[in-house]
Design a protein with these regions (language model features):
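Generic beta-sheet signal
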Residues: 4, 145-151
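Short, well-ordered beta-to-alpha junction loops that form the rim of enzyme active sites
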Residues: 51-52, 73, 149-154, 198
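Glycine-rich phosphate-binding loop signature in dinucleotide/nucleotide-binding domains
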Residues: 40-43, 139-145
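Loop-to-helix element that buttresses phosphate recognition and phosphoryl-transfer chemistry
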Residues: 3-6, 10-61, 124-132
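Acidic, His/Gly-rich catalytic cores of divalent-metal-dependent hydrolytic chemistry
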Residues: 196-215
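Phosphate-coordination/substrate-recognition cap region in phosphate-metabolizing enzymes
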Residues: 34-105
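Short glycine/proline- and acidic residue-enriched helix-loop micro-motifs
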Residues: 91-127
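Domain-level recognition of soluble alpha/beta enzyme cores
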Residues: 167-192
Length: 215
């Protein structure tokens, strides 16, 4: 029996031209989780990250002495590309500056994508789901007792929804709940794969509660 730990990256730079970059708070969040792992003596046999900068920057705050693999299957869906498919070149700019508008549009746009209403998207919903599935297979090494993956909210919510046999629309409900640097754990064997815990953030208990964010 082995453990797959999925970590959502730390807070990125909302409203900035380069979203794929941790904010100052994000670096603090990642350092907190790294310290927690060290205190708990978590020493995975294998670490995997997506190829986006926010995944690498989050991992840099961990002192993990093991092999690190990169796998693009753990990358987030391309929200800007989905917006282009939804709105064309005239994307409303408040989506990038107003959080309420951003998340409302995120839910609507991704739901349309799931239901094949965005034919011009570079990646189809089916292709996204398939690459996440392949990333899970790549990560679940039966020779490892513990595998840590640094990824994003979309892939994590897709894995959780699939594991629970939830309708695809539930992915967005899960996606919008996932906290920065949260930990979701899965147990796997040659014949089974199940959810053990979801969206855990003990590093933000007590005096660190003010550091908790969802985006």
């Amino acid at each position: 029996m082995s453990e797959l730990i999925l970590i959502r990256h730390a807070q990125t730079s909302f409203g900035h031209e380069n979203y794929d970059n941790l904010s100052e708070l994000g670096h603090d969040q990642a350092a907190l989780l790294g310290s927690l792992f060290e205190r708990l003596d978590i020493a995975p046999d294998r670490v995997i990250i997506g190829t986006q900068q926010r995944h690498q920057q989050t991992l840099e705050n961990f002192n993990l002495n093991c092999q690190v693999d990169k796998h693009p299957g753990w990358n987030e869906y391309d929200f800007r590309d989905l917006l282009l498919a939804e709105f064309g070149p005239n994307i409303p700019q408040e989506i990038f500056t107003d959080r309420k508008t951003h998340f409302r549009t995120l839910r609507t746009t991704v739901t349309n994508w799931m239901n094949a209403k965005l034919p011009n998207a570079s990646e189809s919903w089916e292709d996204f789901s398939s690459r996440i599935s392949n990333a899970v297979k790549f990560s679940c090494d039966l020779d490892c007792k513990q595998v840590v993956v640094v990824t994003s909210g979309g892939p994590i919510s897709r894995v959780v929804a699939t594991t629970l046999n939830a309708p695809k629309e539930e992915m967005m409900t899960l996606n919008l709940q996932i906290k920065n640097t949260s930990v979701s754990k899965f147990i796997y064997t040659p014949r089974s794969f199940y959810l053990h815990s979801f969206n855990s953030t003990p590093q933000f208990d007590g005096d660190n509660a003010h550091l908790l964010t969802y985006s």
